[in-house]
Amino acid sequence: IDSETANVETMTNEVVDINNEAADNEGNVSGISDNEVIESEVKDNEIISNETVVKEIKAKEAAVPDRKKAEGKDYIFPPVTLLIKEQQTQSSGYEQYLKETALKLQQTLESFGVNVTITDISCGPSVTRYEMFPEQGTKVSKILSLTDDIKLNLAASDIRIEAPIPGKAAIGIEIPNKHNQTVHFRDLIESSTFEKFKSRLAFAVGKDIGGKTVVTDLAKMPHLLIAGATGSGKSVCINTLIMSILYKASPEEVKLIMVDPKMVELSIYNGIPHLLIPVVTDPKKASGALNWAVAEMTNRYKKFTETGVRNIEGYNKKVKELQKSGEIDPETIKKMPQIVIIIDELADLMMVAPGEVEDAIVRLSQLARAAGIHLVIATQRPSVNVITGLIKANVPSRIAFSVSSGVDSRTIIDMNGAEKLLGKGDMLFYPAGYSKPVRVQGAFISDSEISDVVEFLKENEDVAVYDTEVTEKIENKLNSAAISQEKDEYFEAAARFVIEKDKASIGMIQRMFKVGFNRAARIVDQLADAGIVGPEEGTKPRKVLMSSEQLEAYFEEYL
């Protein structure tokens, strides 16, 4: 009986609990059916679950910043949170150190009979510039001749004297900082200079001596040459250029062609939507890609002529107007994207196919600007046989990183100075239109940051769509080049001649056909490749390996 009584009490308590849960705000429970109680419980659960979902969504949105969408496009710009941010401050006694150095500099110059007044101190990320005004009658050349003495008295690793500073009545002496500050790429991307920059080809270069953000327009450069010794910061500079474009332009606006004979620097970008074709690592294919760009440039100019415009901006504006008015179908005639061709190591290409590569680069650099095609060329061997006079004359904008000698510096920027740079992104930035190069500390971006951005783009783009037409043209060019190693016009006659004489030598071919040594040597090599004559045997004539009948059979089959 006791257990039954306990069960009844438990059931009564449960009913009271249910009624309490179903009660309205005033505590009234009368007139509520069982079904209504159940429905109200379900609705309460729904409200709780919805609130939970909303909270989760808000938490995720707080973790990942707004992903800006390109106007009318599906491209989602990568968030800046994928990049590293680091607060860096100078030590408390640094201002005092700068004043002491300025005083020491002034005293050093006075000891050599040069009186100067320090007018300004500009502290940059890696270098501090002391601006000074010499007294009347002091020759600038005298200050320049004291470079080594200043270096000795200040115990500086290296100094650079800019005399005079462009636009100022002052001389600048640049001295390396005790502690260098890293310029992170995110600092440049988040700066108002970059955000307000209108061009789709904005390039966040770095920070100048005054600590100002330097952003330039690749479209106005219009081609760029980057050179410097190994490990000076060229590849990082190329990465900052590519990442600047990824943060500024959609794939419909800018397309990239990357040539990377080193195979390791740019391959990480395979799969991003901006790539026109996969990263080219074969130097032979690279010349094909450049030749395709020349053909594309010619094709674009034909379209400009047909539509009566002068450049890519005019063409795209006209297409937009015609699309709005409904005169043309947006699917059949589209806007032209700007194309940036990035070559990471020119020296490798110049070794494989110097003639073709140089011709293509010169043609593109002379004519491609208005067609919206821009070249970025990097090399670690700034010698005259890599950066030829023709290439230099047609690529007006330059970036010089640290090099070993003044000769290399003059090859890149036509003046000394790059040999005094510190390395690790320290550069002389010399775009078209500047009277003198500007010293800039290049931005740093790590491999992990690049990987994160590339992965983000791949996730949001599903599958990278490459232009198969371009790839096929490059492959066809390569295959036709391999097949069309055409035989010399004297090949048949020479083959019959050597079989008749039963021996073959370059001298025999020269005398018989009245050709030069090089051509005769090529004919003999072709005969050897065809299996008609044997290999070289020192100074002896080559052996003939075919009979007349075999030769005729060979001609029938292959020629």
What is each PLM-predicted segment?
Residues 137, 169, 174-202, 209, ...:
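P-loop NTPase motor-domain active sites and their immediate coupling elements
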Residues 234:
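Conserved lysine of the Walker
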Residues 67-87, 119-127, 217, 225, ...:
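Flexible hinge/switch segments at interdomain interfaces of large molecular machines
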Residues 237, 241:
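Hydrophobic positions on the alpha1 helix immediately C-terminal to the Walker A/P-loop
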